[in-house]
Amino acid sequence: MCSSDLLIEEIKRQTTASRREAFRQRGEKLAAAHTAAFKRTRQEAANGWDASPVSTARLSMELWAQLKSEDWSYVTGWVNWPMRLWDFTKHYQYIGRAGGEGVGYHAPASIGAALANRKDGRISVSIQPDGDLMVAPGALWTAARHQIPILIVMQNNRAYHQEVMWFQREALARGRSVELTHHGFGLGNPDIDFAKMAASMGVGSSGPITDPKDLAAAIKRGIAVVKRGEPYLIDVVTQPR
């Protein structure tokens, strides 16, 4: 028995019956609050369920529907809907956020994590921001060259949208129009076809997907490829957030 186990046992021994009852009651309250919060989140996620471009909530839910029965690892730092809708129960299911919040982190980090997961046969999955991938697109070639199994699902909102939102907030705070906030941060004209980009580097791909009804089949196909030990990218054109 290690020292931490001994410490835990001693804490249990010294915990009184009244304290254990207090812990139980607090646990019940927290469980009820969690259940209520999850119910609210599911209701929020239903907004724009059939919208095109695809809602980011539906993208996360469609992924979860097929991942929850697998041994999976979420290997990127984008966490909004996954953290609210997925059931994270193991330490390896989330690798954490980028420490400095720098753009260009997600693709190299997720492929590196997928390499680490390869020996365990886990399904590594990444929801990949489009602007972030444009900083280091060569990471796709690395995944193909070294046969790193990873499912990369693009959140393709056709902009460096973190920056767009920042300037929208700044414009509104100063009473100015937000019409010009996409200038310098848009990724359209021409639109980027990430499926073709991936294919050009040897990565299997689907998309661009604009109809959410096409997601399930593409995800199923992608998981099958990853189980064969290969990378796969699904280009999903999404709502901004």
Task: Give short role names for the model-derived ranges.
Residues 1-29:
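Glycine-rich, acidic loop regions that bind phosphate or pyrophosphate groups
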Residues 4-5, 82-240:
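Thiamine diphosphate
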Residues 7-15, 34, 38, 42, ...:
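Structural signal for hydrophobic packing residues in well-ordered secondary-structure cores
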Residues 20-25, 75-78, 235:
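Short coil/turn segments at secondary-structure boundaries
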Residues 24-36, 236-241:
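A short, charged, Gly/Pro-tolerant segment at domain boundaries
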Residues 28-117:
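Active-site diphosphate/adenylate-binding microenvironment
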